[in-house]
């Protein structure tokens, strides 16, 4: 039997960078149609800020292996809505995932395909278990980068299309200086 070699990498806990990892940058323009306030989106789009960066160590897409990645989700808002990641289901929907908060403040918005949603606040040291079949999106509710580690099956894949089409049933907004989770008026069941 031929064995895969183990690897070890050091994550920069201040910046979230994993040296040598595959880097993905998502700008506001990559999130067209995701935010509820289109006017605020179009205004901020002139600057087209970086919303988040992902540093991934990926394996071959096969059963039994694991990928891991850090995400650096920058602070900001579009209208009242905090910056967030696109969010996704897994292409192999029966795959779970683990998130570990490293730095900053935020949370995870999760939902079933029927739109039953759960909000889990996150701060450094928080671990979130994402069960199979749940969509998930992270949200930065603070004023500094929100950095977290994700560990997931290498064959899980990402289904971004379902979220692009239907959205999440809830929005995470700032209202009166507080973080609130409210119904999304554009949610499509």
Swiss-Prot record:
Keywords: Cytoplasm, Gluconeogenesis, Glycolysis, Iron, Isomerase, Metal-binding
Pathway(s) served: Carbohydrate degradation; glycolysis; D-glyceraldehyde 3-phosphate and glycerone phosphate from D-glucose: step 2/4
Pfam family, one: GPI
Enzyme category, top tier: isomerase
Residues the record lists as binding Fe cation: 88, 90, 97, 136
GO-annotated cellular components: cytoplasm
Biological process (GO), any one: gluconeogenesis
InterPro entries given in the database record: G6P_isomerase_archaea/bacteria, G6P_isomerase_prok, GPI/OXD, RmlC-like_jellyroll, RmlC_Cupin_sf
Domain of life: Archaea
GO MF annotation list: glucose-6-phosphate isomerase activity; iron ion binding
EC number: 5.3.1.9
Catalytic activity: alpha-D-glucose 6-phosphate = beta-D-fructose 6-phosphate
Subcellular location as annotated: Cytoplasm
Main location: cytoplasm
Family indicated by similarity: Belongs to the archaeal-type GPI family.
Assembly mode: Homodimer.
Protein name: Glucose-6-phosphate isomerase
Taxonomic source organism: Thermococcus onnurineus (strain NA1)
